[in-house]
Amino acid sequence: MITTKELRNKFINYFESKNHSHQPSSSLIPFGDDTLLFTNAGMVQFKDVFLGIEKKDFSRAVTVQKCLRAGGKHNDLDNVGYTARHHTFFEMLGNFSFGDYFKKEAISFAWEFLTKEIKLPVEKLWVTIYASDDEAFDVWHKHIGLAKERIIRIDSSDNFWSMGDTGPCGPCTEIFYDHGEDVAGGLPGTPEQDGDRYIEIWNIVFMQYNRHADGSTTDLPKPSVDTGMGLERISAVLQNVHSNYEIDLFQALIKKAQQVTHAKDINSPSLKVIADHIRACAFLIADGVLPANEGRGYVLRRIIRRAIRHGNKVGAKEIFFYKLVAELVSQMGEAYSQLIDKRELIEKTLIKEEELFLKTIENGIKIFDAEIENLKDNTISGEVAFKLYDTYGFPFDLTADMAREKGLKVDEQAFLAQMQIQKQRSKEAGKFNVDYNSLINSQVKSEFRGYSTLIEDAKVLEIYQDGQLVASTSEQVSAVVVLDKTPFYAESGGQVGDKGILEGIGFEFVVEDVQKSGEAILHIGKLVKGRLNLNDELTARVSDKPRLATAANHSATHLLHKALKLVLGGHAEQKGSLVDENRLRFDFTHDKAISRSEIEQIELLVNQQIRANYPVTTIETSQQKAKSLGAEALFGEKYGDIVRVISMGDFSIELCGGTHVAYTGDIGLFKVTSEGSIASGVRRIEAVTADKAIRHTFTNENKIIAIKDSLKANDTNLIDKIKSMLEQIKNQEKQIAKLKKELLSGSSNDIKETNIGDIKVVVANVDGVDVKTLRNKIDDYKSKNTKVIAVLTTTNADKVQFVIGVSNALTTLIKAGDIAKELSSHIDGKGGGRADMAQGGGNNSANIDQALSQVEKFILNNIKE
């Protein structure tokens, strides 16, 4: 039996023998493509190559691509574990031609691999083609020799692929494997095609047309090929099993899942869910995603929590999910070294997330059970699903899973509506960003000269004004200018674009920002003098002070990154950065606040490297060579075949396209200004360098001097004086609280109490106390009376504050939250809470006595009913 590992290697080796360049899998996070949540196909990393935006030094490629379908349009999550072939994470085998070979070669390669390399029986294979693709038919029938009746023409979108509404598109041919007569299902194109007998194993897309906005198509000058074959699916065929979950890789994970959950039934769908989900979670974390309540992090959290729920369902009594990582590394670590490199981070993240979830799941399940008891039909409302998500951290899928097990469904549309309301509520006004890619012809190329010079003579290639290509621009008009060569650095890798001027005979253009679009460098700014025309010769001059300050901050981020790893551990991976002339901001993975001692160690390490005055050296080399040198590749960055390696002594080696100082000593001084959390498992450090670091130190020293002067203290006794003052404040606050309690006790004689049968009703206003004191008094009433309803208010100027308590035994008669609403309506206020306790406030204290009288009537009417 051929193993999954052997099949993966066999595919790569076969296409390498056919002169294909083996390219590593790209990240599950698509670079620079906001249209995709996750990489879901092998062609994603080559999208710009197919579009003609990006050029490669090879025209044939082979990949084994990590893919994920668990969010957005491509979402298989609900089916995972319950069908034979649905997965969140999967591996896509693919071979690609970029204007090289076409239909004859692509079909021949696929047929040879299937029938000769892995020896599938010819009689088990069927193919489909697009109905009008006679060329593909001829290749299959005349060149391959496949019988006509085994070639099925399909006149639908199943056999025609497009990248979008416009752009490259073309027909497909698909190869199917026949599992035999004992499996239900019919041939593709028949009413029974959805059965499992005939399974698609390879899809070959012929990109030969360009679709225009009006729907018409024209031939592409260089047709290309994009193919995909699921590794899990073809492994199942070769291992003679019907379900992907029966292949060697999944069986190892399922056995481990059974071991760590103590499940009794090895065939439980829950074990398949866990085996599938550990792959998705581990690879997402390795690619830099961490659990969160939105975006990709939310998808990861959903998958983790779904796996945990299924573990609990089959018997897991303790944290278990992270225990599958070791087996996953054993199965896939050889093919994906990132699993080995990031194993500690993966395990720590899963442990933390499972601990967090277990704290909330018990309460959430109680709420879920309580809600379904009161259901009038078989549908759980979207409001309840949202409450479980928002309050208890239940992903929608988990609520839907629990509902499905009880024969119920969830109103997903209403849930999504609630999500949209929340999103609108928290949405911040964002800046308007021009889509420069839509403005610039992708063939325009600018040469960057800014590593070695800040001044360059250049020629104007294009001018854009209000999104339109123009021949010239006039004074005081904003525009985008593209040059043939430039010293201006375009924003990239967290470093902001340069500022400066473009000047020539009779004109001056102020550059306010610089961006990239394909291979074009865009100078964005305003013409402040004269007139600028196409083909004008000019001098491009970068402002040196901002550039040098930015370079110092950028170099400091490299030193900081290394220092973080040394002080906090290797898991401290960069998650993002911002570098400009004023400061640096650095985001990294770490699951707790950094102590003052750790910050001091980090600052000390960075400043030691600055004082050492190491030369900052640059080499350009292959990615493989850079990796052998130990260079750090940063999350979220896309690197070319040749990369730029920045070294600072032996301390820091990173791939980087940014600008840097010549010596570490040029950074001057490094000082952390803030540290905090920006997301679950992600911390942010902000820092300053050089003169700004010195000024920051001066500012802090001046604050300390001002504090010493105010307290009449010196360096020796300052801390003791502050401690003494805080102790005095603490004692005085205790005394104030005591006096307020005595005041309330003294007022108790004036508080009106009414007894309705065995129910005590207390409604009163007490001046001169705070809400905490009122709350304590309410608790006192409830502890001394099994049936009490208490409403206490206090006023200060026009303001009213109130606390309401209802004994648990009475909440079926009247709820504290309902009383709060009634009181609020009389005092221009708002309030709410639980059935047994509520509080709030209002802006009209003038008629507090009348308001309390109305509230008392409201209470009496409710309890008498």
From Swiss-Prot:
<dbReference type="InterPro" id="IPR023033">
    <property type="entry name" value="Ala_tRNA_ligase_euk/bac"/>
</dbReference>
<keyword id="KW-0030">Aminoacyl-tRNA synthetase</keyword>
<feature type="binding site">
    <location>
        <position position="554"/>
    </location>
    <ligand>
        <name>Zn(2+)</name>
    </ligand>
</feature>
<keyword id="KW-0479">Metal-binding</keyword>
<dbReference type="InterPro" id="IPR018165">
    <property type="entry name" value="Ala-tRNA-synth_IIc_core"/>
</dbReference>
<dbReference type="GO" id="GO:0008270">
    <property type="term" value="F:zinc ion binding"/>
</dbReference>
<dbReference type="InterPro" id="IPR018162">
    <property type="entry name" value="Ala-tRNA-ligase_IIc_anticod-bd"/>
</dbReference>
<keyword id="KW-0436">Ligase</keyword>
<dbReference type="GO" id="GO:0045892">
    <property type="term" value="P:negative regulation of DNA-templated transcription"/>
</dbReference>
<dbReference type="GO" id="GO:0006419">
    <property type="term" value="P:alanyl-tRNA aminoacylation"/>
</dbReference>
<dbReference type="InterPro" id="IPR002318">
    <property type="entry name" value="Ala-tRNA-lgiase_IIc"/>
</dbReference>
<dbReference type="Pfam" id="PF07973">
    <property type="entry name" value="tRNA_SAD"/>
</dbReference>
<dbReference type="InterPro" id="IPR009000">
    <property type="entry name" value="Transl_B-barrel_sf"/>
</dbReference>
<keyword id="KW-0694">RNA-binding</keyword>
<feature type="binding site">
    <location>
        <position position="660"/>
    </location>
    <ligand>
        <name>Zn(2+)</name>
    </ligand>
</feature>
<dbReference type="GO" id="GO:0002161">
    <property type="term" value="F:aminoacyl-tRNA deacylase activity"/>
</dbReference>
<feature type="binding site">
    <location>
        <position position="656"/>
    </location>
    <ligand>
        <name>Zn(2+)</name>
    </ligand>
</feature>
<dbReference type="InterPro" id="IPR018163">
    <property type="entry name" value="Thr/Ala-tRNA-synth_IIc_edit"/>
</dbReference>
<keyword id="KW-0963">Cytoplasm</keyword>
<dbReference type="Pfam" id="PF02272">
    <property type="entry name" value="DHHA1"/>
</dbReference>
<dbReference type="InterPro" id="IPR050058">
    <property type="entry name" value="Ala-tRNA_ligase"/>
</dbReference>
<dbReference type="GO" id="GO:0004813">
    <property type="term" value="F:alanine-tRNA ligase activity"/>
</dbReference>
<dbReference type="GO" id="GO:0000049">
    <property type="term" value="F:tRNA binding"/>
</dbReference>
<comment type="similarity">
    <text>Belongs to the class-II aminoacyl-tRNA synthetase family.</text>
</comment>
<keyword id="KW-0648">Protein biosynthesis</keyword>
<keyword id="KW-0067">ATP-binding</keyword>
<dbReference type="InterPro" id="IPR045864">
    <property type="entry name" value="aa-tRNA-synth_II/BPL/LPL"/>
</dbReference>
<dbReference type="Pfam" id="PF01411">
    <property type="entry name" value="tRNA-synt_2c"/>
</dbReference>
<protein>
    <recommendedName>
        <fullName>Alanine--tRNA ligase</fullName>
        <ecNumber>6.1.1.7</ecNumber>
    </recommendedName>
</protein>
<keyword id="KW-0820">tRNA-binding</keyword>
<dbReference type="InterPro" id="IPR018164">
    <property type="entry name" value="Ala-tRNA-synth_IIc_N"/>
</dbReference>
<dbReference type="GO" id="GO:0005524">
    <property type="term" value="F:ATP binding"/>
</dbReference>
<comment type="function">
    <text>Catalyzes the attachment of alanine to tRNA(Ala) in a two-step reaction: alanine is first activated by ATP to form Ala-AMP and then transferred to the acceptor end of tRNA(Ala). Also edits incorrectly charged Ser-tRNA(Ala) and Gly-tRNA(Ala) via its editing domain.</text>
</comment>
<dbReference type="InterPro" id="IPR012947">
    <property type="entry name" value="tRNA_SAD"/>
</dbReference>
<keyword id="KW-0547">Nucleotide-binding</keyword>
<dbReference type="InterPro" id="IPR003156">
    <property type="entry name" value="DHHA1_dom"/>
</dbReference>
<feature type="binding site">
    <location>
        <position position="558"/>
    </location>
    <ligand>
        <name>Zn(2+)</name>
    </ligand>
</feature>
<keyword id="KW-0862">Zinc</keyword>
<dbReference type="GO" id="GO:0005829">
    <property type="term" value="C:cytosol"/>
</dbReference>
